[in-house]
Amino acid sequence: MKTKHLAASILATLGASNAVFADHSWNDYHWARTTSSFDLTIINSTTPDWDGYVSQAISDWSQSNKLNMIEDVNGDTSSRTRRKCNAPDGMVRICNLEYGQNGWLGIAGISLDNQGHIITGYTKMNDSYFNMAYYSGDDWKQSVTCQELGHDIGLGHQDEDFDNESLFSCMDYQDPPYEYPNRHDYDQLGIMYGHTDSYNSYSNDGGDGGDGGGNGCNAPPGKGCNKGESNSGQSIGWGRSVYKRGNAEVFMRIDPDGTRHLTHVTWAIGHENDHGGHDGHQH
């Protein structure tokens, strides 16, 4: 099987860093396809209370003329599946669960083949926060669902400063949140998918995709289930810190088979310094 590189982006409960970017692709990550548009299967493994938000986000992203998200409404909703949230190669799985009060509302992760194309993705929605009164509204749930699925197709954030003026996009950090993509999001997808490739990564056969960080472990480095040695390829969870700037931090874990896992974290205010294992550098 091809070596996979897994990257994850985490939306925190509150956090701030970086400014507005005109180009908000996520490091040019995209799904390989041989046609100008493609159908991407989203396996819905959320509980019924999330179905409406997932269906709405899938419909919104399908307004792009470059991709059409197809909802698989028969996704397994067992707690085991939702904790790991693995997706088959060529597809995306979205899950919800009480993952713990660890500072994030949602995670989006992608796995890359050896040519740098996305071959699988996943999204986790953290009910430990969405069950709280502050985050229980439709606006937060819809916005985070929209944003994390946007990451799964290769989009980054338009802005990561909660205090900036709203850009009216779910790919913008803002409070109160905005629930839908905007024209710039669709234009960015048009640029990212404005070419064709020599093969289709969305139709690959294979086993499970990324597991959302550490085989279900969602604890910060040095805490709880994530007590592996930070510089070891055997470490579990997020691994070692390789970058930190304000409330933003990036962790890397390397598996014995060479698979690399990158996790981008935007810490909640008050959480940026209460985790262990930082051995990276600040900018």
Predicted regions and their residues:
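Disordered inhibitory propeptide/activation segment of secreted metzincin zinc metalloprotease zymogens
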Residues: 2-11, 16-49, 227-283
